[in-house]
Design a protein with these regions (language model features):
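A short helix-loop-beta-strand connector motif used in the catalytic cores of GNAT acetyltransferases and
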Residues: 42-66, 83-86, 103, 181
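Conserved GNAT acetyl-CoA-binding A-motif
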Residues: 123, 130-155
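C-terminal "cap" of GNAT-fold acetyltransferases
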Residues: 153-166, 172-191
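Conserved acyl-donor/pantetheine-binding loop and adjacent beta-alpha core of acyl/acetyltransferases
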Residues: 58-60, 68, 72-110, 114, ...
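Conserved beta-strand edge residues that scaffold enzyme active sites
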Residues: 71, 144-145, 177
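Conserved N-terminal entry element of GNAT/NAT acetyltransferase domains
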Residues: 1-38
Length: 191
């Protein structure tokens, strides 16, 4: 298995990774944090959510990276400048300085491909993507689960251990809690 991580420019593959099973569903598409306006997020319903993601995929930079095993898409990581996300105004996640930092907030591995190290490839790919687009630093907001089992539906934020293994360091606590675990701010300087 040779995993390759590429910018998310193929809408069909993004849809495979984060699109809902029902086209009229009002969930996922990895938009909740990507959109800076909660009003826009709540106003996008059903197929309009997918159309918005289709627009984002055509923009430069695209909204994240995809992992492939050969021609098969097996993973997704959302990564973009923090200023273009809801983290720009999030009161629970602190800003530690004024750098134009990038954020990685969702790491998703396709069922049937979990426990193969793909999340590590995705995080490394997100770092490379941010660096190639001029990011001075990249940060994530994983849970500090201290090795305890994490509900699979909440694992999308990653774990502190994953980010540490990717070279990130904890720089701050947050006021955010997910699945009963505190989230921490992890950062990697890219300068």
């Amino acid at each position: 298995m040779a995993i390759e991580v590429r910018p998310a420019t193929a809408f069909a593959d993004v849809k495979t990774m984060v699109g809902p099973k029902r086209p009229d569903a009002n969930v996922c598409w990895c938009l909740s944090y990507r959109l800076t306006s909660s009003k826009e997020n709540q106003g996008l319903v059903g197929p309009a959510r997918g159309k918005r993601v289709q627009q984002l995929v055509r923009q430069r930079p695209p909204p994240g990276v995809l992992a492939y095993d050969g021609d098969e898409v097996v993973g997704w990581a959302a990564v973009h400048p923090r200023a273009d996300t809801s983290f720009a105004r999030n009161r629970k996640v602190p800003h530690v300085d004024d750098l134009d930092v990038w954020s990685v907030w969702c790491i998703r591995v396709r069922p049937g491909h979990r426990r193969e190290g793909i999340s590590h490839h995705l995080l490394a790919g997100a770092v490379d993507f941010a660096r190639s687009n001029g990011a001075p630093a990249i940060e994530g907001y994983p849970v500090d689960n201290k090795g305890a089992k994490l509900d699979l539906t909440m694992a999308y934020v990653g774990t502190m251990s994953l980010f540490e293994q990717g070279g990130f360091a904890k720089v701050a606590d947050t006021d955010s809690v997910l699945n009963g675990f505190p989230r921490v701010l992890m950062r990697l300087d890219l300068r």
